[in-house]
Amino acid sequence: MLQPKKTKFRRQQKGSQKGNAQRGNQLAFGSFGIKSLETKWITGRQIEAARIAVTRYMQRQGQIWIRIFPDKPITRKPADVRMGKGKGAPEGFVAPVTPGRIIIEAEGVPYEVAKEALRLAAQKLPVTTKFIVRRDYDAQNQNA
């Protein structure tokens, strides 16, 4: 499961997620990608499920890049515990995602294969996404 090796603090405030992504909102590595259209927290398990779906469909051809990493600790109090008495114990890590953030990128496969693989990955994620293609992508010359 994805999580940081070491964190400076064990607990973190929730924070607010307003506005669109200011960074990580353009394709940087591949020709294809999926872009988030809403604000949500994505867990390491969800990212891993999406990664497995993509690699299985692409049959280990091409290359993929995961552009998000779960580095925000989430706490939870046990069941049947009253309010107060301090913050709960750390339960796991999430990656905060805002609209416009690129989640996964792919390269080295035909357009149809990339579109279907990233559609399968998007089904594993809790956010609505949009399939995007690099602006200078030429379908005629890319017969991978």
From Swiss-Prot:
GO MF terms, alphabetically ordered: rRNA binding; structural constituent of ribosome; tRNA binding
Q: Where is the composition biased (Polar residues)?
A: 14-24
User: Which Pfam families does the record match to this protein?
Assistant: Ribosomal_L16
Carries keyword Transport? no
Among InterPro entries, the record links this protein to: Ribosomal_uL16 (IPR047873), Ribosomal_uL16_bact-type (IPR000114), Ribosomal_uL16_CS (IPR020798), Ribosomal_uL16_dom (IPR016180), Ribosomal_uL16_sf (IPR036920)
Name the GO terms of the biological process aspect. Answer: translation
Keywords associated with the record: Ribonucleoprotein, Ribosomal protein, RNA-binding, rRNA-binding, tRNA-binding
Q: Mind telling me which GO cellular component terms the entry cites?
A: cytosolic large ribosomal subunit
Spell out the Basic residues composition-biased ranges. 1-13
Is Endoplasmic reticulum set as a keyword in this record? no
Show the segment(s) annotated as Disordered: 1-24
Q: How does it assemble?
A: Part of the 50S ribosomal subunit.
PANTHER family the record matches: 50S/60S RIBOSOMAL PROTEIN L16, LARGE RIBOSOMAL SUBUNIT PROTEIN UL16M
> In UniProt terms, what function does this protein have?
Binds 23S rRNA and is also seen to make contacts with the A and possibly P site tRNAs.
What is stated as this protein's family in its record? Answer: Belongs to the universal ribosomal protein uL16 family.
| Protein known as | Large ribosomal subunit protein uL16
